[in-house]
Amino acid sequence: VTVDDAIDVLQEEVTEDIEKMAAMLPGDKPYLKTGIFETWKARTPWLMLLMLSATFTGIILTHFEKSLMACAILTSFIPMLSGTGGNSGTQASTAVIRALSLGEVRFSDLFQVLWKEFWVSVCCGLCLAAANFVKMMLVDRWLLQNPTVTPQVALVVCATLVGTVLCAKLVGCSLPLLAKRIGFDPAVMASPFITTIVDALSLLIYFRFASAILGL
């Protein structure tokens, strides 16, 4: 086996992993040589599945529609919470998928991984919440003169931020291990579903805190 052959194999493996993590069926042709129909066929199944699974987010929003109407300012923070949760989950899943591929962790290490990510998420969540509270008070309330951004609203958002980061990292680190355990490719199983799961969880946490703190 020549060095060039080995490099070609490595490139193909890396490309396949990247495509899997982006919710695409792996292809064996260069991008410009892959036909439109082939590309469509590789991308549509996962997009369809993720679109259907994302309806849970819509159901949650519909269920708490009255809360949103009573405190409309809550709506403006949903993208930030969902984005932060998705990014947090992706960080954890990427680290675990890489560790699995290198043989650094196994399913038997699940609780050790969860314990580590729990404390990482607590530290990250508290740091993000503190920064966000300052931003909401100084920028949103004082600089932009938005009276609807009250300390109570900021508390709801920041508490949700901590809970979302915690759930996202625990989901992100456990899904690849569970996928490996049941015989699925961790990159295929974990990455596409993390954002969908975290979006739903973050909304549930958000509206529960809003109900408890704001009395909605």
Model feature map: region roles:
Residues 26-27, 38, 102, 124, ...:
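Short helix-perturbing small/polar motifs within transmembrane alpha-helices
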